[in-house]
Amino acid sequence: MSRIIHSEDDDDDDVGSQSSSSLSSPSKSLQQDPIPTKIPLSTSIILEKKLPLEQHQKLSNLTEGSTAGGHVSNNSLDNKIMIRFVPIGSTPSIQPRVFKISATQTVSTLNRFLCKKLKFKGVLNLYIQNSFMPLPDEQIGSLYGLFKTNNELIISYCNTIAFG
């Protein structure tokens, strides 16, 4: 049996009684607060997101077109984007400079394509708008969506590191 004894000030009895009651109330509130239980992620529920009406209609049209006609239009699945290749420094240029390529291709595919066109043994350094080197596994479509200029993706290439 433990007891806590609080001393009160001699000057003002009301202030002392308030302080002693305020000191004892936090301990009561700590005892009354329940301890949160941890719930593992395996018990969580995954809610399905409903598609907006416009996207739902496009999806249903796409599935109907593939079952009825046997194929889907090239415009919906095989999105081609324009890429302009610009040489940096003494790297030889290719003709023509503008090519169409599928949006699902990766940067490493572009690198192999340029090496084949230039008959270059090794790896070229590719830059998006002369500012940064994209990752080799990055898709061209995502880069095009972020960095297109006049409906073209400008990719500069060099056989040495051009920008530190």
Swiss-Prot record:
PANTHER family: AUTOPHAGY PROTEIN 12, UBIQUITIN-LIKE PROTEIN ATG12. One of its GO terms (molecular function) is Atg8-family ligase activity. Pfam families: APG12. The keyword Cytoplasm does not apply. There is a cross-link at G164 (Glycyl lysine isopeptide (Gly-Lys) (interchain with K-148 in ATG5)). Belongs to the ATG12 family. InterPro entries: Atg12 (IPR007242), Ubiquitin-like_domsf (IPR029071). Transmembrane segments: none annotated. It comes from the Eukaryota. GO terms for cellular component: Atg12-Atg5-Atg16 complex; autophagosome membrane; cytosol; phagophore assembly site membrane. GO terms for biological process: autophagosome assembly; autophagosome maturation; autophagy of mitochondrion; cytoplasm to vacuole targeting by the Cvt pathway; glycophagy; piecemeal microautophagy of the nucleus. It is found in: Preautophagosomal structure membrane. This is Ubiquitin-like protein ATG12. Residues 16-29 have a biased composition (Low complexity). Keywords: Autophagy, Isopeptide bond, Membrane, Protein transport, Transport, Ubl conjugation pathway. Its main location: membrane. Residues 1-36 are annotated as: Disordered. Forms a conjugate with ATG5. The lineage of its organism: Eukaryota, Fungi, Dikarya, Ascomycota, Saccharomycotina. Ubiquitin-like protein involved in cytoplasm to vacuole transport (Cvt), autophagy vesicles formation, mitophagy, and nucleophagy. Conjugation with ATG5 through a ubiquitin-like conjugating system involving also ATG7 as an E1-like activating enzyme and ATG10 as an E2-like conjugating enzyme, is essential for its function. The ATG12-ATG5 conjugate functions as an E3-like enzyme which is required for lipidation of ATG8 and ATG8 association to the vesicle membranes. The keyword Transport applies. CDD domains: Ubl_ATG12. It is a peripheral membrane protein.
